[in-house]
Every structure is written in C-alpha cells, then in structure tokens.
Amino acid sequence: MLSWLKGHKRYCRFKDCTCEKCILIIERQRV
C-alpha cells in the first residue's frame, strides 16, 4: 500500500499534497 509512496514522496510532500493518490490515502487514514 505504501510501495508507491516511497518514490512519490520524493517530489510530493504527503501532508500538503492535493493529488488524487494522497487525498485518497488521507481519507482512508481519517476513517
């Protein structure tokens, strides 16, 4: 589940990112 995050996190700050992938993960974490 976090496999893509390793490479994606390089150029995408997870907390401040608004891309679809991060938004989906943030929503899942809230639940």
From Swiss-Prot:
GO terms for molecular function: metal ion binding; sequence-specific DNA binding. InterPro entries: DM_DNA-bd, DM_DNA-bd_sf, DMRT. Its main location: nucleus. Residues 1-31 bind DNA. GO terms for biological process: regulation of DNA-templated transcription. Keywords: DNA-binding, Metal-binding, Nucleus, Transcription, Transcription regulation, Zinc. It is found in: Nucleus. The keyword Transcription regulation applies. One of its GO terms (cellular component) is nucleus. SUPFAM superfamilies: Cysteine-rich DNA binding domain, (DM domain). Pfam families: DM. Belongs to the DMRT family. May regulate transcription. PANTHER family: DOUBLESEX AND MAB-3 RELATED TRANSCRIPTION FACTOR DMRT, DOUBLESEX- AND MAB-3-RELATED TRANSCRIPTION FACTOR 3. This is Doublesex- and mab-3-related transcription factor 3b. It comes from Danio rerio (Zebrafish).
